[in-house]
Amino acid sequence: VKKKTIFIIEASSYQLEYSKIFRSKYGAILNISPDHIERHKTLNKYVKAKFKLLKNQFKDHLAFVKKDDLLISKELKLIKLSSKLIKVNTKGNNFIKKINNKYFLTETNKENLSFILEISKRLKIKRTSLVKIIQNFKGLQYRQQIIFKKKYLTIINDSKSTSFSSSIGVLKANRNINWLLGGIPKKGDQLNLPKKYFKNINAYIYGKSKKFFIKNLSGKIKYENFDNLKDAIKKIFTIIKKNKFTNQTILFSPSAASFDSFKNFEDRGSYFNKLIKRYLNEL
């Protein structure tokens, strides 16, 4: 660790809730959607916990927030920040349009990239260096990770997804989707996916919380339900074998916590990969 070393910390609302002294010179809230309500009890308390990241900042610090986020805008009207506020425009950035790395084509990752550009500008990072890194970035494991791709089939492992909002971007960015979802849903979570995407998706619900997911998908997206992930994957591969030359996407984006059957999302992602490897050998 050197004097100029920059630490990048992802602080959860769980950590921020009880934090009194943690502060960062560059604080960023990318977006806010209903999450962890089972922990914080109300959406308002969840928002307050997130905003502690910015409220603890000093006068010479910078607070980065998404420009058009309704919950962020609402909270900003209620509080006073000591730091300088920078509203990040996540739409219409010409630089982002030039990026051809497929990992950054989803709406969510375009938003992430908008924040990266704004913060790197303040850190005086050379644009040429940044472009090189972005173009060659392979993504993180179990976060919209393409684990298999051939002419007619793409398989994406997005085990990190623990809410509907975290699945929206990847659902919008792909076609002919076989969507695997299940686990422990977030209290009060709702699927806010525009209607035009419904016909593009067939859902395969697995696990004990089927009723919750069926309620959210019913009348919107075609679905089948299964007792476990293995049975759901088996059914998808049966369909793909019959339609081998039709482009298909298998998307594992559970939209729920993993603790019903797994130690964590990494354990869940690893298990998915093992099942996929087995069924690919049978194609």
Protein language model features and the residues they cover:
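Flexible active-site lid/hinge loop adjacent to a nucleotide/diphosphate
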Residues: 1-104, 260-266
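C-terminal helical cap/extension that packs against the catalytic core
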Residues: 190-248
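Residue-level signal for inorganic ion chemistry
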Residues: 10, 30, 46, 64, ...
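Nucleotide phosphate-binding/pyrophosphate-handling subdomain across enzymes
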Residues: 102-200
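Short internal beta-strands
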Residues: 63-67, 180-182, 200-208
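Short glycine-rich anion-binding loops that position phosphate/pyrophosphate groups of nucleotides
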Residues: 13-15, 34-35, 68-70, 162, ...
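Glycine/aspartate-rich loop-and-adjacent alpha/beta segment that forms the canonical ThDP
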Residues: 255-282
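Beta-strand->loop->alpha-helix junctions that form or flank phosphate-binding loops
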Residues: 79-95, 131-135, 145, 224-230
